[in-house]
Amino acid sequence: MQITKPALLVSSLLIACAATDTAAQEKPRTQPAYNYANVSFADYDGGDALTIAGGVEFNSPYFVSGHYKTIDSNAISASRDSVGFNLGRYFWLNSGLIADVQARVGRVDFGPLDSNYWGAEANLRQRVDQFEFYGGVGYLNYTDAGSDNIYQFGVNYFLNQNTSVGVGYQDSEYGDGVRLRASYHF
């Protein structure tokens, strides 16, 4: 997998922020973390992926998020890129339990075939001390490649108020995979 200069820059910034925040040892965050920047690495059936993502809450409880993903694909012997944007709303359900719904649009490069996509996603997040457990379902419709149902779950561990690391699992009709993530929350 080829790592691009923007990926290295964002990764370096996240590591620097994580080191600064770890030294501060602040109290864990207890509110939802929709303001974030993260980098993740995933091992999927069809290859490996590096993702740079971020989100901003712009008018509570609404948020926008986006990602750039590069996938080194074994299935098509090529690299694939994906760019996507989400617009969502979250709902406080109970102490530490939050639901969110999101509309998604984007574009993915399937090697020789490019396709736009649209879809929806719904997630539940439960905060317990420094752990945040999540699970969700999603649907994507690719204009040139059919549709996909997505199921995911995982856990994030907050090292301090602004830094978390996590592991997640995602299953879809195009394959499944495990994702490792480091996030900075602001």
Name these PLM-found stretches.
Residues 36-42, 55, 65-69, 100-106, ...:
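Transmembrane beta-strands of outer-membrane beta-barrel proteins
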Residues 56-58, 89-91, 105, 124-126, ...:
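Residue-level signature of outer-membrane beta-barrel architecture
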Residues 60-66, 92-99, 128-135, 157-167:
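Repeated loop/turn-to-beta-strand initiation elements of outer-membrane beta-barrel proteins
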Residues 1-33:
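Cleavable N-terminal export/targeting peptides
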